[in-house]
């Protein structure tokens, strides 16, 4: 073997054609006939509204890292891709595009509009697939799904009909959140409440046949046309005499009654409220209670309808101004006040949302809320990472209201309900009525989240229902990776819809992540213009650098702060790995062959040391990856590669490669440890790990390798002390400007019992290390004229009067003494904290006790040394 990497790491060259290579080798394809254990992830489908953003890059990198890790650890994996039609969002985009071309959606008609929407979908689906490739996602494209695929559409209809027949879905006229710009109902979670500078308007409602009036405050005068009564509290002595009397509505002169209800807060405002059941949720419930009529005074576009008389056709906010102007003229206006209140805006159009009485389809939530809460309180609960989000889910489900699932859109799953043209009979079914010419289908479509809620299993059925082999093998899916912002939007709905239809949970684990924030810790948004295009980062620094940054900064449930500096640090890490790999390849002979049994020979101590460190790293990384703790796994691996392998073992190997006795085993060790490093790094940095691996001429791909662990446990702990000694002596040379060709004599003093034994046992080896790596002779007798370097509880005494600076040494030791005193205080507080003792794992408590004792030992050694120095 004689392979050489390019002298310089070039991410563009490394990442070029790799993805196609993986696809050509079918390395991402699930093997349904494999006897390996199954592991599956269904990709949360991105919306076909546009390109992927940095949040998608993070979300998908997490999933891909899990899939690659599981593949390397012996699983048959399925990573199923798909996209979401995203009803309202996509329709808004397509409408805007048509508008730019001078085309009106309504004139175009439904069928032709849908053709335009499908063109949009195809265009952006292709863009998204290219972005998936740039991100290196190991997706099985043979299983790709779209939420409007015919087989998915069939499942959606089947479940709608089942839920309807089971009386879970119903149609009713209720108050909904209405987007007057998009002319559709939207769900509660699609309403964004913002603190807004508003006004409160006070009007006179004059009593019938009297000059008296009651003052009523409202923020929405345009809804007064639909007022049905005034309401006062029966216990409010100010207004008891007016109950059952009548007043004249100041905007339309209609006579309406005054009724009483304890719902009215005596202390709020004037204590009199107007009741408009069709335009306010609380008023709606009062209307039902008191059997009030519910006329609607606004059109679906937010303009005033025929109830507004002379105001008919005016936009609601234009009408508001005119109503106030005319009320002033008629002396029916009292005053206006500036207020700050919470106003609901549509998440998609940013229009102010209207509470609006409308015929809609709903899902009953009573059964489902109990279903989810009971599940999460059982032994079969879905595991949330971190666990606190299971409680968040339970709280949201406790407060859940019936879910409005109909949308007044064209793009989406049209509701499978037909109305008879003559009798208005309603028919709900998977297939249309046989005499279709006599029926008209419901024009509404389903809320996008209804079909998305079926995603975990509908993607696996392939027109074969629950008998599908994919469903049998890969369901429930292994883990869902998603953001905390859509736990109720999506996660909860997937759980209860899946449970209701399949009687199984949709996934075993849920890994929750946060948001990607900018470098100033602000949420990324179009309005701030602070978004990051992941494709730009990939072009400039490589996909591996982006993924390494995202994954090594990923803590379950937490936000991540984007950092150009950390992206560059990731690139530098990969560059160091590249250069280390070049060093390995340059030192291998033409006829080098890897011997998988090389470690069974009598290995030199540094080869033993790196294999022991490797084994510890493999164990740690494996454990943390299985718990989705990517930051801990990645940073531990980073430290091992950078510090132990590149910085120290490669340096040790240079000596061994010049010793015929150790040359062969050192080459084998260099090669083997590099291979294992690449396998561990592959889930994080797939492109460069594959490139280096292919140069090792082993298998067709690193994805065909197996995550292993030699369980090496050689007695090499003294090497860690050697490294500390070498580092301290080198730092001492640099600080004192002592050239490397000046040989230093040193002695080790103040060792505790363990170190005394250890250093005695390995004296000759330590001598050789210090001599070879920092031109230092280790002597076994005390040195009188010396400079002392503190390492843990012991000292390195350097014999050379010209280097002594007693005052500086005392100062350094006093600083370390202060540091240790602080650490001892901190450790004491922790160990005296009963909550910590009660909740912490035993190994965590033991670790803190060991630290505490080490601090005490080090402090005593420094005190003794300071005493010795001050007595000289």
UniProtKB/Swiss-Prot annotation:
Subcellular location: Cytoplasm
EC number per UniProt: 6.1.1.9
Residue sites binding ATP per the record: 526
GO MF annotation: an example: aminoacyl-tRNA deacylase activity
Top-rank taxon, per record: Bacteria
Annotated motif 'KMSKS' region, positions: 523-527
Catalytic activity: tRNA(Val) + L-valine + ATP = L-valyl-tRNA(Val) + AMP + diphosphate
A biological process term (GO) from this entry: valyl-tRNA aminoacylation
Intervals of motif 'HIGH' region: 46-56
GO cellular component: cytosol
InterPro entries: aa-tRNA-synth_I_CS (IPR001412), aa-tRNA-synth_Ia (IPR002300), Anticodon_Ia_Val (IPR033705), M/V/L/I-tRNA-synth_anticd-bd (IPR013155), Rossmann-like_a/b/a_fold (IPR014729), tRNA-bd_arm (IPR010978), tRNAsynth_Ia_anticodon-bd (IPR009080), Val-tRNA_synth_C_sf (IPR037118)
Domain writeup: ValRS has two distinct active sites: one for aminoacylation and one for editing. The misactivated threonine is translocated from the active site to the editing site. The C-terminal coiled-coil domain is crucial for aminoacylation activity.
Database matches in NCBIfam families: PRK05729.1 (NF004349), valS (TIGR00422)
Subunit field text: Monomer.
The protein's name: Valine--tRNA ligase
Organism name: Mycoplasma mycoides subsp. mycoides SC (strain CCUG 32753 / NCTC 10114 / PG1)
Biological classification of the source: Bacteria, Bacillati, Mycoplasmatota, Mollicutes, Mycoplasmataceae
